[in-house]
């Protein structure tokens, strides 16, 4: 169980600490937006004009805007972004998910 939380907790904690605006996509396709106010093993408290308790089992994707680094340097000395990809790799254009309907 602790292994599964080792990526989730630092990521959500960075979003909370830095008050990063996020979009949370639910498994039913609904998009929620706000800031992570708090979280635990089962829920995320998302704050916008109101606070919403969102159960993690209903979440498909959490998308920060802008991207957030949630960990320090890797053993090789480079810093990975939140996707864990190579920051020196050529960047591919990304399609906006709102246009893909």
Curated annotation (Swiss-Prot):
It comes from the Bacteria. The keyword Iron does not apply. Gene3D superfamilies: 2.30.30.100. PROSITE patterns: SM. Pfam families: Hfq. Keywords: RNA-binding, Stress response. GO terms for biological process: regulation of DNA-templated transcription; regulation of RNA stability; regulation of translation, ncRNA-mediated. One of its GO terms (cellular component) is cytosol. Residues 70-86 have a biased composition (Polar residues). One of its GO terms (molecular function) is RNA binding. Residues 62-101 are annotated as: Disordered. Residues 9-68 form the Sm domain. RNA chaperone that binds small regulatory RNA (sRNAs) and mRNAs to facilitate mRNA translational regulation in response to envelope stress, environmental stress and changes in metabolite concentrations. Also binds with high specificity to tRNAs. Homohexamer. Belongs to the Hfq family. This is RNA-binding protein Hfq. It comes from Yersinia pestis (strain Pestoides F). The gene is hfq.
